[in-house]
Amino acid sequence: AKVKETTGIVGLXVVPNAREVLINLYRKTLEEIKAVP
């Protein structure tokens, strides 16, 4: 599901804060990876 969300955000390249959204997604992904033992 998260992969689809990422694809949707990338599809909206017109969004001004797209970079901010991608950074937040990147942080979430890193946190989830850290949570994995």
Curated annotation (Swiss-Prot):
One record GO biological process: respiratory electron transport chain
A single cellular component GO annotation: mitochondrial inner membrane
Keyword Membrane applies: yes
Subcellular location: Mitochondrion inner membrane
Source organism superkingdom: Eukaryota
Predominant place of localization: mitochondrion
Keyword Transport belongs to the record: yes
UniProtKB keywords: Electron transport, Membrane, Mitochondrion, Mitochondrion inner membrane, Respiratory chain, Transport
A Pfam family reported for this protein in Swiss-Prot or TrEMBL: ETC_C1_NDUFA5
UniProt topology in membrane: Peripheral membrane protein
Oligomer status and interactors: Complex I is composed of about 45 different subunits.
The family this protein is said to belong to: Belongs to the complex I NDUFA5 subunit family.
The protein's name: NADH dehydrogenase [ubiquinone] 1 alpha subcomplex subunit 5
Species the sequence originates in: Solanum tuberosum (Potato)
